[in-house]
């Protein structure tokens, strides 16, 4: 439960082959207190490989705070975050990312003056890969997300749906085990929402926890 006055729930699309050994994320009684009030009051969550879990609830229920505690942007007052059998409660965000926790923020995070492929290559350059490996990985992501035709376009010219495809592609550069999506359909037109939904479903089929 999150916030005694306004609880939220976790809606889950399970993986048919999930087992206990495939548990990717567990939260144990997470609590966050602001101004003497528990805005998050003991949330438990379990996410396995190949599962999609969504946090549902009204505004002010504590969804964003819970999300931030999981990715490492906010430190809980009590409780634990277990990621791939490691207690990461005290880990900063970058250490969680190194373990395979991907994060796609609601706010636009692309480099607007760079091209689509430059945006992907910029993230790839942070990895210990050769130039050829970076190029191949970039081409693979461009193809996977159907953005090859706009690879040379600057990011500021993209539609909402194209930007979302690019941001998801960038978040997968490090090949995470878990992808945290904050309002993934925000700023996306209704027609493109379906395309983004299909991308998420396909990622789930590949075994990614979402």
Regions found by a protein language model. Name each.
Residues 179-182:
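Catalytic Walker B motif of ABC-type/P-loop ATPase nucleotide-binding domains
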Residues 79-86, 99, 137:
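Conserved ABC transporter NBD signature motif
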Residues 175:
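Conserved catalytic motifs of ABC-family nucleotide-binding domains
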Residues 194-206:
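Helical segment within the ABC ATPase nucleotide-binding domain
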